[in-house]
Amino acid sequence: MSRIAQTFSQLSAQGRKGLIPFITAGDPYPELTVDLMHALVKGGANVIELGVPFSDPMADGPVIQRASERALAKKIGLRTVLDYVRAFRATDKTTPVVLMGYANPIERMGIDAFAKAASEAGVDGVLVVDYPPEECEAFAKTMRAAGIDPIFLLAPTSTEARMAQIARVASGYIYYVSLKGVTGAATLDLDSVAARIPQIRQHARLPVGVGFGIRDAATARAIGGVADAVVIGSRIVQLLEEASREQAVQCLTDFIADIRQALDA
């Protein structure tokens, strides 16, 4: 059983919801990335999504775009991201880490070489935002062969056929995008999310995490009422953007602890 599957199995047995925060690797301070990952766990995260900086992050709103730009300006590439995971794994053997990003950096490294390097570093899952449906099956097969869960997005616009296809190739969890548009976009519609998740579950037996538009404890708790996990990205990246170097780790721990408390209430 993969670390991700094990984590969700334990959460289910405890009657708890998963908390999946996202940070951009190398932002805002490259030397703090591993400390921030540990801060997420201390606050109560169950899975960490670590963003791989990319120059054209088309699914991301301005907050995460700026984070990518700052990290790239500091020369944070895919190999450095894998180094962060390796350093995190030196002291945390249990918290799953999912790399989230775009196809280009992976294809530049080579998919087979990436799968091997990511597995050796201790990566548990990979979510590539821009793989078209016709390419995702081969990619998923390569990842699974390396012991990495291929994670895919579904959106309000996803067809039943797309859901069925993703159900065939995905493992770990399914990331449901609660809004049309980019990360950090406007208010989400809880009723539409609540209606959509049972449709996804008709096709896939995997846990469903919901992200995009979750900015505070109240929204997280509401989403936790209908989904298996809550994914929070833009709000965290914004907090880190605004925090000083000295405050960043504590600020992140406190924010995650508030969300965790709301989910467990």
Curated annotation (Swiss-Prot):
As its record notes, the protein acts as a catalyst of: (1S,2R)-1-C-(indol-3-yl)glycerol 3-phosphate + L-serine = D-glyceraldehyde 3-phosphate + L-tryptophan + H2O
Catalytic site: E49 (proton acceptor), D60 (proton acceptor)
Q: Which UniProt keywords apply?
A: Amino-acid biosynthesis, Aromatic amino acid biosynthesis, Lyase, Tryptophan biosynthesis
Q: Which GO terms describe its cellular component?
A: cytosol
Q: Which EC class is this protein assigned? A: lyase
Q: What Pfam families does this protein map onto?
A: Trp_syntA (PF00290)
Q: Which Gene3D superfamilies match?
A: Aldolase class I (3.20.20.70)
**Which InterPro entries does the entry link to?**
Aldolase_TIM, RibuloseP-bd_barrel, Trp_synthase_alpha_AS, Trp_synthase_suA
Q: Which GO terms describe its molecular function?
A: tryptophan synthase activity
What are the EC numbers?
4.2.1.20
Which residue spans adopt a coiled-coil conformation according to this UniProt entry?
none
Q: Part of which pathway?
A: Amino-acid biosynthesis; L-tryptophan biosynthesis; L-tryptophan from chorismate: step 5/5
Under the subunit heading, UniProt states: Tetramer of two alpha and two beta chains.
Give the protein's function. The alpha subunit is responsible for the aldol cleavage of indoleglycerol phosphate to indole and glyceraldehyde 3-phosphate.
PANTHER family for this protein = TRYPTOPHAN SYNTHASE ALPHA CHAIN, CHLOROPLASTIC (PTHR43406:SF1), TRYPTOPHAN SYNTHASE, ALPHA CHAIN (PTHR43406)
Query: Which family does the entry's similarity section mention?
Result: Belongs to the TrpA family.
- Protein name (database record): Tryptophan synthase alpha chain
